[in-house]
Amino acid sequence: MTRKILVTSALPYANGSIHLGHMVEHIQTDVWVRFQKLRGNECHYCCADDTHGTPVMLAAQKQGIAPEDMIAKVREEHLADFTGFFIGYDNYYSTHSPENKQFSQDIYRALKANGKIESRVIEQLFDPEKQMFLPDRFVKGECPKCHAQDQYGDNCEVCGTTYSPTELINPYSAVSGAKPELRESEHFFFKLGECADFLKAWTSGNNPHDGKPHLQAEALNKMKEWLGEGEETTLSDWDISRDAPYFGFEIPDAPGKYFYVWLDAPVGYMASFKNLCDRIGVDFDEYFKAGSQTEMYHFIGKDILYFHALFWPAMLHFSGHRAPTGVYAHGFLTVDGQKMSKSRGTFITAKSYLEQGLNPEWMRYYIAAKLNSKIEDIDLNLQDFISRVNSDLVGKYVNIAARASGFIAKRFEGRLKDVADSALLAKLAAESDTIAEQYENREYARALRDIMALADAVNEYVDANKPWELAKQEGQDERLHEVCSELINAFTMLTAYLAPVLPQTAANAAKFLNLEAITWANTRETLGKHAINKYKHLMQRVEQKQVDDLIEANKQSIAAAAAPAAEESKYEKVAEQASFDDFMKIDMRVAKVLNCEAVEGSTKLLKFDLDFGFEQRIIFSGIAASYLNPAELNGRMVIAVANFAPRKMAKFGVSEGMILSAATADGKLKLLDVDAGAQPGDKVG
């Protein structure tokens, strides 16, 4: 039976260029969508620009244009970049749309009627010059822990500590430079804590389509930490409102109050799909009504799991809609082992890649060849990129057609021999279900390894049968025709297998093969006595100069990525040189982790219950991003500063020491290992 599927990628924010980090997700999604369509399923792929919020408003003001004009321009740029990489959206829309406004307000009203919205008076920092309340990231100051300057209002990028904006020393507005004031304001909260029972059931449940989990195992473990165990929950209610001035949608019956961008952003999935449905005549309600039998999948980055696996399903369910079938998260992209960061400009833009004339299918293949169903970071190693593309796509795949097509054209009038009984083709066809399952399960790396293994088998067949020698031998025309026909059929099968990853090459190959289009059926079927067209070269090799030119075009961002500690070093120089006596004041001890857990209300902190041998202590550490499953640290030995002055960690409690960790090249913090035999309380030094 034909499946009905809605698929989305996370919405790019309308405040900058698309970089290759974005492309990881959109390539991952596009490959899956193209596979579904090749299989004959009704699959709709929708996305949009995420256009609301203070950053967009301020960026437009800085440019001296209306926010509406700025986001329209950015959307055109984003769509051009994605289209250049053959991302085949059925609709690429904007969250600043009439559909999104209507859906956002309807969902809010439904949640309010369901008792899930509550108003509260809160205190916030206010910019007296700009007459606006300041989001955390628009307050800067001195870190209260390490005293690094110019740190954001929610966490320190030097030492990793999280805090509230009011804890900053000498805070100032990043908008005007003014000293902010603490003022009261009425805000609206989505009572997420009351949704815990539903969320515990949904996050740990399986979808009715095929019985697979709604979430990946790593994501489920993280949700369990946030949701708590048993009847208790650690979920905090969610502030869904912002004060004017703000670029977004005004909350019904609340003048001067606007929906926080993270409320209307996921609703943008609905809006984009509704816009598509109205254009092509699809029943929108069939996909979003409660109890819908259709499928809905969201492909996202691991950094926005909290919103998509908790807020979004709860918003949908308690407003009378269906919840997602699956939420699939991926890791981040690094370049030559270094972290990419949009906020710091350390990224290779999609536009620069295209402008340098590099084939986008090279990057599609390379990224797909590293993706699997787990939440793992992937690295773009530029030398490996060159060698893998040249070896796999040019050396193994397209050369098959190049080596056989000339003989078919010159010796057999462009017509193939019927080779339905070929053992080689039977071998390729036998892998159809396995490779289909790998695509379905997002195990692209495994699928492409298997496809390249088949390509190796075809090339071994070429070398064993040597069509160039058969062409020179008397009485071998029949055998030459047979061998070359097998090779063209094998090339067709490989093209069908690769079509989700290489859509443009597949389309060009279809023209050469004289086929209307490549479908998944081509992985099993032979072409018979089929006439083909003259072969045109399908793919060039990657040249070192092309990659060198790409690096040159992005040299400032690449240089920043290659020296991530440069900015931090200025803070290190502030400290005076330590003497031996100074060092001896630091009492470092071995401690055993009795229990480690996530901290409610913080995406940075982990809470450690530690046994120092002589006593037990609680220490908070800002390493949550490095350990998605904190429970795996239970029983581990760590090194901690035992005489570090206790420090109050905002609303989370008192930290009674400091755990030592190492900052890796990709920006993560990793706990230091303790050699076997060390016991809790042992002194380090």
Swiss-Prot record:
Domain tRNA-binding: 582-685
Gene Ontology cellular-component annotations: cytosol
Catalytic reaction list: tRNA(Met) + L-methionine + ATP = L-methionyl-tRNA(Met) + AMP + diphosphate
Enzyme class, first EC level, given as a word: ligase
InterPro entries: aa-tRNA-synth_I_CS, Anticodon_Met, Met-tRNA-synth_bsu_C, Met-tRNA_ligase_1, Met-tRNA_synth, Methionyl/Leucyl_tRNA_Synth, MetRS_core, MetRS_Zn
Positions bound to Zn(2+): 143, 146, 156, 159
Keyword field contains 4Fe-4S: no
Positions bound to ATP: 342
Compartments, as annotated in UniProt: Cytoplasm
Record has Cell membrane as a keyword: no
Motif 'KMSKS' region: where in chain: 339-343
Quaternary organization: Homodimer.
Protein name stated in the entry: Methionine--tRNA ligase
Source organism of this protein record: Neisseria meningitidis serogroup C (strain 053442)
